[in-house]
Amino acid sequence: MGEPQQVSALPIPPMQYIKEYTDENIRKGLAPKPPLPINDSYMMFGNQFQCDDLIIRPLETQGIERLHPVQFDHKKELRKLLMSILVNFLDMLDILIRSPGSIRREEKLEDIKLLFVHMHHLINEYRPHQARETLRVMMEVQKRQRLETAERFQKHLERVVEMIQNCLASLPDDLPLPNGADSVKTEPMDVQEPCTDHYKGSQEAAASMKEATIDKDAAMCVIIDEMT
């Protein structure tokens, strides 16, 4: 009779898991499917939980006596619980000194345990608020970082534009053009020309200005090449 197969409580090693999802297995449809969502109950840390359970369950559903009222101030109740724990701890020390074997020691220990359970429960009721506040702070940090990044980009852009304008302003007017290009000549337009000639002349003037700008850019590139 063979020995029963032992099942590990831990997941399989990562490399063995990765080997199941190779390109060939995915192409052939042999890769394992993802596990189905849990619909009823599950085990976690040795305890069974229902999927529809509340994140923070009331004390009554856990079989624990409620010491505070239904409507209360969390801060006041937490302070009261803290003082009660301190007083009960001092009582416990007094019992341990006077009569360590007394039954009151177990009773006082249960009282302290109940107080700690209530304190943890009230603290856990702040968890949703803590999660929302953490998300808000995280989003504010991301917003501030993005605004600072955009501001730095804007400053760099202004600096680059200023440098380019200074470079263009420092170019002499009689700078020789590369490849023997002719200088651009512009003449005033005759006011007696018809509208069609005026439109044609505007197009020619715009083309001339564009060529002049290109020539200046080319000349600046030549200067930079000579400097380097």
Curated annotation (Swiss-Prot):
Intracellular or extracellular location(s): Nucleus
Predominant subcellular localization, coarse grouping: nucleus
SUPFAM superfamilies named in the record: Mediator hinge subcomplex-like
GO molecular function, one term: transcription coregulator activity
Short name of any one Pfam family annotated for the protein: Med7
GO biological process, one term: regulation of transcription by RNA polymerase II
Keyword terms of this UniProt record: Activator, Nucleus, Transcription, Transcription regulation
GO CC field: mediator complex
Gene3D superfamilies: 6.10.140.200
Function: Component of the Mediator complex, a coactivator involved in the regulated transcription of nearly all RNA polymerase II-dependent genes. Mediator functions as a bridge to convey information from gene-specific regulatory proteins to the basal RNA polymerase II transcription machinery. Mediator is recruited to promoters by direct interactions with regulatory proteins and serves as a scaffold for the assembly of a functional preinitiation complex with RNA polymerase II and the general transcription factors.
Assembly notes: Component of the Mediator complex.
Family to which this protein belongs: Belongs to the Mediator complex subunit 7 family.
Protein's recorded name: Mediator of RNA polymerase II transcription subunit 7-B
Naturally occurring in which organism (per UniProt): Xenopus laevis (African clawed frog)
Lineage: Eukaryota, Metazoa, Chordata, Craniata, Vertebrata
